Amino acid sequence: KGQVEYRDVTFRYSKNSEAVVEHVSFKAEAGQTIAFIGSTGSGKSTLVNLIPRFYDVSAGEILVDGVNVQDYGLEDLRNKVGYIPQKAVLFSGDVKGNLDFGHSQETPLSEQAMWQALELAQSKNFIEDKEAGLESEVAQGGTNFSGGQRQRLAIARALARKPEILIFDDSFSALDYKTDRVLRQELAEKTKSMTKLIVAQRISTIMDADLILVLDQGKVVGQGTHKELLANNEVYQEIAYSQLSKEELEHGK
């Protein structure tokens, strides 16, 4: 469960506008990590936003577990997907309420599940340090937490629901490199069955992905592992060498 397949997907915001995403095809098997990289405006975020149907494809189709996303009820589809946006959204209330958001009222999350999600998202320490713990207050927009903390709480919220598919829409950019690395190692070990789709700007975030798609102006201009792309894809090489040294780049898959 958690297989995602794009079949010749094209998306434009309106009938006559230019395609933001054009003729994209790939398949993610359950449990795989697929990453998307490319310059700003290359269509990475739009591409993953088509899975939970924030937008609908203009042509082609997207299948989740072999079923077209348009044939699911929206709630059923979104229950399969944990989506973490680039800008974490927190609501006024307490930590508990923020983690439980999106869970059905009949089966609220247990505190144990919340702590597990917080630990996995590298948030346990700063919540434990607060006197009220899970009952700690969250200001509107989460302004009483740092940017990196807000991001980790949004990741914990998505993890707590145990979705089949996790979509990180550039969600690692607010984290420092060390937290980013530790979090990805933990995710790799403890969410093996979840399919992970990662939109990123930093090569270091995606070097271990099973498949990386390089996007340029809405088109896939390369796909493969880090090693393959580093050897034969100019767009990827350009991004990679502008960020990391040759030695650092040799550690990926």
Predicted regions located by residue number:
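ABC-type nucleotide-binding domain
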Residues: 1-253
